[in-house]
Amino acid sequence: MARVKRGVQVRQRHKKVIKQAKGFHGRSKNCYRIALRRLEKSWQYAYRDRKVRKRDFRSLWIQRINAAVRSFGLVYSVFMKGLKAAGVDVNRKVLSELAISQPSAFGEIVNKAKAAL
């Protein structure tokens, strides 16, 4: 049986890892073994932060809604209770976008929520 040398495959694999580690600091960007460790850690961070991003955006939407609703004399929790009572089924993302881009439409929604309380 002939001897199989894997020089080409190893070089390709190393090149792929080094290419993915572009932008890292120190030897993490050009030393294969260290780059591989840093890449695995970066994948862990990416996995974790994809979950955290959802929480962060939800809290951002709530902060925006709360700030906009306070100008109408309500607080966030009372406003959401009024929306539920009025039967208005709009999610927080849309509400925050309305509060920023179309304050008049958001004001109508706030008035509906006030009327339902």
Swiss-Prot record:
GO CC annotation terms, alphabetical: ribonucleoprotein complex; ribosome
CDD domains (alphabetical): Ribosomal_L20
Alphabetical keyword list: Ribonucleoprotein, Ribosomal protein, RNA-binding, rRNA-binding
Single GO BP term: ribosomal large subunit assembly
Pfam families with a match to the protein in the record: Ribosomal_L20 (PF00453)
SUPFAM superfamilies registered for this protein in UniProt: Ribosomal protein L20 (SSF74731)
Highest taxon, organism lineage: Bacteria
Any GO MF annotation of the entry: structural constituent of ribosome
Tagged with keyword Manganese: no
Xref: PANTHER family: 39S RIBOSOMAL PROTEIN L20 (PTHR10986)
Function, in words: Binds directly to 23S ribosomal RNA and is necessary for the in vitro assembly process of the 50S ribosomal subunit. It is not involved in the protein synthesizing functions of that subunit.
Family per similarity comment: Belongs to the bacterial ribosomal protein bL20 family.
Protein name per Swiss-Prot or TrEMBL: Large ribosomal subunit protein bL20
Natural source organism: Neorickettsia sennetsu (strain ATCC VR-367 / Miyayama) (Ehrlichia sennetsu)
Taxonomic path: Bacteria, Pseudomonadati, Pseudomonadota, Alphaproteobacteria, Rickettsiales
Gene that this polypeptide is encoded by: rplT
